Every structure is written in C-alpha cells, then in structure tokens.
C-alpha cells in the first residue's frame, strides 16, 4: 500500500509540474540529465519558446530554467544547449536560476542562459566528464574512442570558455591534475559564470 501511494504521489507531482510549467513559463531541471529527462525538458522548452515566438517581441516573457541537478549525460547536455541557442538567436530570452547546486552538465546548461542567477549559498561544479565502458575492445576501437573523446572534451570546453571568463588553460590545468573546479556563487560571479546573486 505504501509503495502504491508513493507511485501515485510521484505521478501527481509530475502532472502538477507539467501543468505549472506552462502557467509560470518555468522548467525545472531537478534530476540527473539522461536521454529521458532531456527529452521531457526539450519538449517543454520548445513548447514555451514557440509560444513566445508567436507573440510580438515587446510582449514576450523570458523562459525560466530552475536548475538543481548533479548533471549527467554530456551529449544530452549539448543537445539541450543547442536548443537553447536556437531560441536565443530568435530573440527568446532564457533565464537560468541555480538553486542549491549545479554540477557537470547542469553547470553547462546554467552558464548558457541569457541572464544567469544563483543564490547566496549555491554551489557550482565544473569538471572533466566521465565515461563508463564495458566489454572487449580492439586497438582500433580505442583509437576511435580517443578521437571521439577528444572531440567531446573540446566541444564541452568551448561551451565553458565562450560563456564565461574561465579560460581553456584553466580547464586544461584542472583536467591534467584530475581536479574538480568547485565554485561558490561569489566565485562564479567573478568568473562570469553567473550574472547576479539572488539575496
């Protein structure tokens, strides 16, 4: 009985979120980034942005992304960022709000907003992406993987460098020493990772 109630409660919360996002022009990025979660958020983003596109520019409202996520899939993250850029180029403003934390892919989505906000005690984390592999691979497989991995690393680095004051040298140094780049909201503001601290 308890498990059934939990499932019903979760379904009810999801339905409420789906209804509220249209009313508030707000999308909640509040779980791990997977192909499933990104597909949901992408549909919501397209829906909200297309509604704004149907209005005259002076009547448009910004779409808000409320971010509280530990990140996840790098390629799915880049897809969502591409979608954000598509609408930003069409004069749709997308505001990002980092609440408790934004790590990894969520960090990268956060820095791509038209305006970017975090709270006083928010924590942001930028790090090299991780990859999990299984099975036996040939030498050529590993060569091909290295090329793909290098390309993905460069794509992710470009997102960070082009949207903040974090330099490629800083990123490469953290990667070389296998360190996470953890930031307070104050440090994030100094590095142009965010534009404003909400207090």
Describe the role of every protein-language-model region.
Residues 1-107, 111-199:
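N-terminal organellar transit peptides
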